Amino acid sequence: MRTLIIVLSFIVVLPVWADGHLSTEKTVMQLVMDHWEARDNNDYETQADLMSSTGTYNANSDGSFFRYSGNVSADDLENSMGGQSSSLNVKYPETISLSDDVVLSRYYLEGVISDDGGTVNNYRTRVTHIWVKEKSGWKTKSWHFSPLHDGGRHITSSSDFEED
């Protein structure tokens, strides 16, 4: 009986180890954290390096339409985001390997964002973030931000953060 349990355990666990999902998902999870740390530190070079060289597909939390952004340089990011400051926290991150070269990450992002137009003290959004493996490593290919204010229909409570 003991031998049967051990054999069945290997049958269930071995495919996950064999295809590298665990290490891939951990790698991408760290890149998510690295990106937002770079954002908070105005490290445009790191942010640009984490973007796909063939561009990204984006939908921002400001309600703008889906858009494509071509290859973005550190200078481009500084020109568009210079003067902003942020203190953002990634909450409840998950990474899911969809194939050998595509990983879905999803998480909540909350914190404070400021620019010349003012400060958002309660920035909260959901992020669906697609990473692809390119020659130079894992890169952001697409992301969608959806604000968590939900039109006033939902009041956040502690149960929103409880595990099932």
What positions do the PLM features span?
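N-terminal hydrophobic targeting signals that begin at the initiator methionine
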Residues: 1-2
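Short, low-complexity N-terminal intrinsically disordered segments enriched in polar/charged residues
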Residues: 16-50, 158-164
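A solvent-exposed, acidic/Ser-Thr-rich amphipathic alpha-helical stretch
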Residues: 22, 26-27, 43-101, 107, ...
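Short beta-strand segments enriched in hydrophobic/aromatic residues
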Residues: 51, 109-111, 144-147
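Short, cysteine-centered beta-strand-loop-beta hairpins and adjacent loop/turn segments enriched
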Residues: 83, 111-121, 149
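A short, structured loop/turn motif at beta-sheet edges
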Residues: 95-104, 118-119, 131-139
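Low-complexity, intrinsically disordered terminal/linker segments enriched in charged
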Residues: 125, 133-134, 141-164
